[in-house]
C-alpha cells in the first residue's frame, strides 16, 4: 500500500458509496470509483465481531490488497469486511477478492 493514501474525509466515503461501482464477494464487499487519485479504505463494522476480530480482518484485507496493488488502476477503493470473513481461509479470500476486482474491471 505504498502508493495508495488513506481516505481523509467523510465526503470521500459518501462519493464512493453513491457514485462508485459495488461488488459483493464471499467475505468482502468492494466499492470502486475510477479517479486520478489513489486511495484505499478498509472497513469492518461491529457486526464482524469484537475489536480483535475486526482488526484481524482489516489486516487480512490490507495484506490482500498489497498483493494486487501494482496491477490495479488508479482510483478509490473501499473494502468492507462481512461477518463471514472470519470463517474463510486466506487463499479463499484472495481468490474471491481477485475475482471481484476483475468483475469491477479494476486491473490494468
Curated annotation (Swiss-Prot):
GO terms for molecular function: 3'-tRNA processing endoribonuclease activity; ribonuclease P activity; tRNA binding. Keywords: Endonuclease, Hydrolase, Nuclease, RNA-binding, tRNA processing. One of its GO terms (cellular component) is ribonuclease P complex. PROSITE patterns: RIBONUCLEASE_P. Its EC number is 3.1.26.5. Disulfide bonds: none annotated. It catalyses: Endonucleolytic cleavage of RNA, removing 5'-extranucleotides from tRNA precursor. InterPro entries: Ribosomal_Su5_D2-typ_SF, Ribsml_uS5_D2-typ_fold_subgr, RNase_P, RNase_P_CS. Signal peptide: none annotated. The keyword Chaperone does not apply. One of its GO terms (biological process) is tRNA 5'-leader removal. Consists of a catalytic RNA component (M1 or rnpB) and a protein subunit. Belongs to the RnpA family. RNaseP catalyzes the removal of the 5'-leader sequence from pre-tRNA to produce the mature 5'-terminus. It can also cleave other RNA substrates such as 4.5S RNA. The protein component plays an auxiliary but essential role in vivo by binding to the 5'-leader sequence and broadening the substrate specificity of the ribozyme. This is Ribonuclease P protein component. The gene is rnpA.
